[in-house]
C-alpha cells in the first residue's frame, strides 16, 4: 500500500484502500492478458466469494456485499473492452478487445487533464476489431505533454464502442501518493421512478475510487 498511496490514517481507511489496491492490481493483470490474446486465452481471478465471515481476497464477502474488485470486474471482463498499454517514455497505446462473434468499431479519445478536470491535450482515433480478436491502435507519445508536471496531470482514455457500450481508463504518471489530487466536493441527487432508484453524483474536481453507501 505504502508504495502507491499515502498510508491510511485509520483502520477503516486501511480496509478501503487495500480493496482499491487489490482491484487495481487484478484489473492491470487481466487487461494485460486480454491484450495478449493468442498467447493468453483467458484469466480467472481467485476468488469470487466467501463461504464464511472472514478477511479474505474474495471480491464478494460472506454477506453478498461487493468489494471494489467486483465493481472493477464488470468493466475489465466486458465483452468489448478498451484498455491502455503504458510503455516507457510516456507512450500510451489504446487497445480494443472484442470477445463477441461480431465485428466492432470504437472511437477513442485520449485526454491529458489537470486535477481540476480541465482538458490540456487530446487525441482521437478510430479502430475496427474483428470477432474474437484484439486490435492495437496508434501509440500516443505524451512525454512532451506531461514532462515536468507528472504530479499535476493524469491521462484518461474514453472508448465509445459500436455496440453501445463505453470503456473508460485513467492512468497516473506517478503513484497516487505523489499526485497533487484536489479535495473534491461531491454532491448527490436521488431520483425514484417506480421501483427504480437512481443516485447521481456531481463533483467539482476529479474524484477517484468513490463509493456510495446507503442504509
Residue map of PLM features:
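Intrinsically disordered, low-complexity Pro/Gly/Ser/Thr-rich segments with frequent PxxP/GP/PP motifs
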Residues: 107-149, 215
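Surface beta-strand/loop "capping" patches
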Residues: 74-110, 177-203
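Terminal connector regions
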Residues: 111, 136-184
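Hydrophobic, well-ordered secondary-structure elements that form the walls
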Residues: 43, 94, 157, 201, ...
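Intrinsically disordered, low-complexity Ser/Thr/Gly-rich stretches
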Residues: 181, 206-215
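Short, contiguous acidic/charged loop-to-helix segments that flank catalytic cores in large enzymes
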Residues: 13-18, 60-61, 126-132, 145, ...
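Short loop/turn segments at connectors of secondary-structure elements within structured domains
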Residues: 39, 102-106, 121, 149-151, ...
